[in-house]
Curated annotation (Swiss-Prot):
Disordered: region residues: 98-148, 172-220
Protein name: Uncharacterized protein ECU02_0010/ECU04_1710
Compositionally skewed regions (Low complexity) per UniProt: 206-220
Biased composition (Polar residues): 175-201
Length: 220
């Protein structure tokens, strides 16, 4: 008895989905040329299917081995997907510094999954994460640096004190350490000429005190 196959009356017949994993097709010439110079195409062993792990560090000028693109499609990426504007949009869009680890049993329903590594080379690499799970409030921001205004004012004031001889007077009063001062007489001149104590007191009083600041310092 002859068996005849009835034609499908569906307007758009769809083929039956294969349950087996298809073989990896040959790479695009652009990918194969880049793969010879840099091992940037890898197949993760812990993922099902045949995705392509594309490291865009050689294409993205903003990513220094910190971004990777995992394509779940069963075909090699088109050359348009490897153009710099499309491969750099992850760096231009978000800067993820503290990625959250996704559950191991999680399945990605999207077509693309991003593997983002922390920019610090000493820190361990982050696992596969979703870019839509991070918000601006969840980004780790560095601690604000200490105010450099006080430090700059301190340096400015110390320079004014040193230029006006305030540091010399302070060192002579507290530490009794000889400090080079062009206005102060040298030890040789003191040994030959012994001035009166009243003259020394008048000189000390004529110099500005530690508490008196110039007008430029008081304006600060």
């Amino acid at each position: 008895m002859e068996q005849r196959q009835l034609p499908c009356n569906h307007p758009n017949p769809t083929p039956r989905l294969r349950t087996s994993v298809p073989a990896i097709p040959p790479l695009h010439p652009q990918l194969s040329s880049l793969a010879t110079s840099h091992p940037w195409i890898q197949k993760p062993s812990h993922l099902k299917g045949s995705p392509y792990l594309l490291s865009i560090s050689s294409l993205c000028p903003l990513a220094t081995s910190s971004c990777a693109l995992l394509v779940h499609s069963q075909h090699p990426p088109r050359p348009s997907e490897l153009s710099p504007p499309l491969s750099c949009f992850l760096c231009q869009k978000e800067t993820l510094t503290s990625p959250r680890p996704s559950p191991p049993s999680h399945h990605c329903p999207e077509s693309l999954t991003y593997q983002v590594h922390q920019p610090n080379p000493k820190s361990p690499s982050g696992p596969l994460v979703h870019s839509n799970r991070f918000k601006a409030s969840e980004r780790r921001r560095p601690n604000p640096p200490t105010s450099s205004l006080k430090l700059s004012c301190h340096i400015l004031l110390s320079g004014i004190w040193r230029s006006n001889g305030f540091i010399t007077m302070k060192d002579k009063r507290n530490n009794n350490t000889p400090v080079s001062n062009p206005e102060a007489p040298s030890s040789d001149s003191l040994s030959h000429s012994t001035p009166n104590s009243s003259n020394l007191q008048e000189k000390a009083l004529s110099r500005p005190s530690l508490t008196s600041f110039p007008s430029s310092v008081s304006s600060i």
